Amino acid sequence: MSAVSCSSVRATVAPKAVAKRDVAKAAKAAKSVSLAAPAFAAASLAGPAFAATEALSQTADGVGVAVGGAAAVAAVGGLLIATDPNKRREDMKSSAGGDEAKSVADYFNSTGFERWNKIYGETDDVNKVQLDIRVGHQQTVDKVLDWTAGMDMNGVTVCDAGCGTGSLAIPLALRGASIAASDISSAMVGEAEQRYNAEVAAGKKAPAVAPKFEAIGLEECSGKYNMVTCIDVMIHYPTDRVNGMISHLASLSDDKLIISFAPKTLAYSILKRVGELFPGPSKATRAYLHAEEDVEAALNAAGFKVTRREMTATQFYFSRLLECERA
């Protein structure tokens, strides 16, 4: 079965060895993440927070806010009502001529690429929050690799939708899979291809079929694959588009579909809104949480059943991972 082409908005990268090196550093760093807002100076409890949400973009710029306990959450109620994240989202969309996909692509081809390429690279030039995000994302990627560890990947066709800089596509390709990796950002795709070539040049065995890296949008994704993966991408899709996104990804897979998303719970919704209070000067992405039951219902409607699920939750990153198979 030949790999054709696929894509999505985003997913990202960090070599597994680098993530292991960084785990201890991230754990230590998380203990000392400081509060950036005087209004929350009394907060002290550090639970899973902000993660791949609105707060991710601003914390990636070095702004960190922790909310400690029910009293602190209650204290920000008025501020939450006063903010208007939807207006910021609409302003961003308007600047791209009303095209939401283009606005996301523009971001990840410019400041977004610079930020996330650093976070998911090997550089030590990251702050405490960025380090935590790097480790959290890599933990999610590692879970996918662990789930597929018992599979003979030689000749298996895989569509990595929203490949980012190749954190998942590259190791799967080096295990022999025939990869169609794509992303809406040409900068991300270019970086992924460079990283793959560097791995092969360093002595890693190239697969029989070289991976195909392509900068295209989700709607242009086509073909049939043994497995479709879409990691840390749904956060860029509003609720009214998620069902269509899942249906489209499911139509590409003959056997297996693996996706991740930021789950919508009361606690995470509050933390997301707190993050929206501090958008930061280069804040340019929108972020969406999704109810797990809604995601699973969309998967069932598309002919898939959930066979495995995992949760990754660090200080500043949280992601629900689902493995699905044809029902």
Task: Describe each PLM feature range.
Residues 229:
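A conserved beta-strand element that flanks and buttresses the S-adenosyl-L-methionine
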Residues 285-303:
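Short alpha-helix
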Residues 159-161, 165-217:
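Class I SAM-dependent methyltransferase SAM/SAH-binding core
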Residues 254-263:
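Conserved beta-strand signature within the Rossmann-like core of class I S-adenosyl-L-methionine
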Residues 61-114:
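N-terminal auxiliary segments of SAM/dcSAM-dependent transferases
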Residues 131-154:
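Conserved alpha-helix/loop element of class I SAM-dependent methyltransferases that forms part
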Residues 237-248:
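A short, conserved alpha-helix within the catalytic core of class I
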